[in-house]
């Protein structure tokens, strides 16, 4: 038995493979199972070119054999095996891919799904083992060979005994220490979970001897344990099956099996794309919002597979943030992986797949809104806020993508409506899309600012979430119709001549009110929007009163204030009391003015600056 050295700085490269390339030691099993699958594929390919050979898929499988006494883990396959020369060339040279060499020698086109690319997957075994033994017999050969290495001082190759072709890879596990428990890779539950997680859709059976329990023969309650060989993996991915043969239960069960959620999804999409990009995907739109969805702990992303092998549990690059609620998987052969297969190289194919998925999701939501309104409203109740964040984020870059998916409660319809539905039934003389902002629909219905708009027969959209107005400010208009808050200074309804006349006639009292309130307001003016209320607040400029409330509640509050205007109903009886007070008792006039302003603040849901002063003012009136 001859001791051989690793070729061409392979020792140094092996150290890099073991300590730098792989960040997660548990993926060693994924790599070795993928290699075993490739080895069986090569046998299948050999039989295609030789009519004297047959390939019965039922005869080919991968076996995982833990041995707790010897602390070894064996991965066996009935694949093509290796000759002595191939052992020396493939395992003696780090980063030489035997699979790529096989494809080249046999002139196999890229459509043949061999997983291996880089020739380093085998060496991931050294993440958990301090010695690896390989016993292999090549397809059609008479002799078997043993390759053995500790990953440090080269390797040995010697003749061995093996009845049939294929390969056994025996991992001699490292000793446990304070940081690592390598014995866990001998436990049945751990091996099953790793196979299901990473290699569930390998096309050949992955078998494991499983301990089970049964009632002992001849007894009623006495149980005995027995060992039975079990196929752990599913083999055929749901996304590669004909969608016409699948039922809703198939998709719903897969949703639960993958732990995307514990209830039924609202919608599923089964996508198969071939062309410039090729991928298969199953996507789900959940009905209910995850408990942590609006927290920093929530991670968006789709499970990403390459040739049925899990590459990433959550590939965030496949989903824009505003569709981050979507769950599912994507499988593609066109991905450029890095050498560890743990991460993707940033390439055009991934971007194309992501763009295509984004379009598919949007189309599905639009279809749901049009054809299944009840389901869409369920979805929107859970995730509508996220769509509105999408409009607002990135300086409105995605507003055109999302605007048709938005919905708001309507004063006229008493239900949720889309912007398209609102615009479609606008009156001919209506200039704006009107909206009102408040904590709830009930609160908005009591707002004094809505009176004039409703009297004109115009519809008002109710904004009850903190993001609503910010999103609409970014959207600016819809189908060339601008948005207008009922609390804005100019509603586009009032007669300018009448307003000007009333403000001129009451110039003195308005100036006195402004003087009494000082910098709290920017102006006092006559209101044409009020009927039953004496006063209300409106705003001028880009920052509305509601936006001020939201911004002031934020931790990094910059003290942004709306330019408040106190609007006065000159037809209200309180206004006559104001005029009398101005003529006869300036202190009482100032008191009335402050009380009316504070009343307007309370109606808007704003805090009174000095509650003690406010209660004292009320007491003065009661004396």
From Swiss-Prot:
Claim: Chaperone is one of the keywords in the record: yes
PROSITE patterns, per database record: HSP90
Region described as A: spans on this chain: 1-341
Region: B, residue numbers: 342-549
NCBIfam families: PRK05218.1
Its biological purpose: Molecular chaperone. Has ATPase activity.
Subunit structure: Homodimer.
Full protein name: Chaperone protein HtpG
């Amino acid at each position: 038995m001859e001791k051989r050295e690793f070729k061409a700085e392979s020792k140094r490269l092996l150290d890099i493979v073991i300590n730098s390339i792989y960040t997660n030691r548990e993926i060693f099993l994924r790599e070795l199972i993928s290699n075993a699958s490739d080895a069986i594929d090569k046998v299948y390919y050999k039989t295609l070119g030789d009519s004297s050979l047959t390939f019965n898929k039922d005869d080919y499988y991968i076996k995982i054999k833990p041995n707790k006494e010897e602390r070894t883990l064996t991965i066996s396959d009935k694949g093509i095996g290796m000759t002595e020369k191939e052992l020396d060339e493939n395992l003696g040279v780090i980063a030489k891919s035997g699979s790529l060499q096989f494809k080249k020698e046999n002139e196999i086109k890229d459509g043949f799904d061999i997983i291996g690319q880089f020739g380093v997957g085998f060496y991931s075994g050294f993440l958990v083992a301090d010695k690896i033994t390989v016993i292999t017999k090549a397809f059609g050969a008479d002799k078997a060979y043993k390759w053995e290495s500790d990953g440090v001082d080269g390797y040995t190759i010697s003749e061995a005994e093996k009845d049939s072709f294929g390969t056994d890879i025996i991992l001699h596990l490292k000793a446990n220490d304070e940081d690592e428990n390598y014995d866990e890779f001998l436990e049945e539950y751990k091996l099953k979970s790793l196979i299901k997680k990473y290699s569930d859709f390998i096309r050949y059976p992955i078998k494991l001897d499983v301990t089970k329990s049964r009632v002992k023969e001849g007894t009623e309650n006495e149980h005995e344990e027995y060992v039975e060989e079990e196929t752990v993996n599913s083999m055929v991915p749901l996304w590669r099956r004909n969608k016409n043969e699948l039922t809703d239960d198939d998709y719903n069960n897969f949703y639960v099996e993958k732990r995307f959620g514990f209830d039924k999804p609202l919608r599923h999409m089964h996508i198969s794309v071939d062309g410039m990009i090729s991928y298969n995907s199953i996507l789900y739109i959940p009905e209910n919002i995850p408990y942590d969805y609006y927290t920093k702990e929530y991670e968006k992303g789709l499970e990403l597979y390459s040739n049925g092998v899990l590459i990433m549990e959550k590939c965030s690059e496949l989903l824009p943030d505003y569709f981050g609620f979507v769950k599912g998987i994507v499988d593609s052969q066109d991905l450029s992986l890095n050498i560890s297969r743990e991460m993707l190289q940033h390439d055009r194919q991934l971007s194309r797949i992501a763009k295509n998925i984004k379009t598919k999701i949007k189309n599905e939501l639009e279809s749901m809104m049009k054809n299944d309104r009840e389901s869409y409203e369920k979805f929107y109740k859970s995730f509508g806020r996220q769509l509105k964040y999408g409009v607002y984020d990135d300086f409105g870059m995605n507003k055109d993508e999302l605007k048709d998916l938005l919905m708001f409660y309507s004063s006229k319809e008493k239900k949720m409506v889309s912007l398209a539905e609102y615009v479609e039934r606008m009156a001919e003389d209506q200039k704006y899309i009107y909206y009102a902002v408040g904590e709830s629909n009930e609160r908005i219905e009591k707002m004094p600012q809505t009176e004039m708009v409703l009297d004109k027969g115009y519809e008002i959209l109710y904004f009850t979430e903190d993001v609503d107005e910010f999103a609409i400010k970014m959207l600016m208009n819809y189908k060339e119709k601008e948005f207008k808050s009922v609390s804005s200074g100019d509603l586009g309804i009032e007669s300018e001549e009448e307003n000007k006349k009333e403000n001129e006639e009451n110039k003195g009292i308005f100036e006195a009110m402004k003087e009494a309130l000082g910098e709290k307001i920017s102006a006092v003016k006559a209101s044409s929007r009020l009927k039953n209320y004496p006063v209300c607040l409106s705003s001028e400029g880009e920052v509305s009163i509601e936006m001020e409330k939201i911004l002031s509640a934020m931790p990094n509050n910059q003290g942004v204030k709306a330019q408040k205007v106190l609007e006065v109903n000159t037809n209200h009886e309180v206004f006559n009391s104001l005029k009398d007070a101005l003529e006869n008792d300036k202190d009482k006039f100032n008191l009335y003015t402050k009380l009316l302003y504070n009343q307007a603040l309370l109606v808007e849901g704003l805090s009174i600056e000095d509650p003690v002063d406010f209660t004292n003012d009320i007491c003065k009136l009661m004396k």
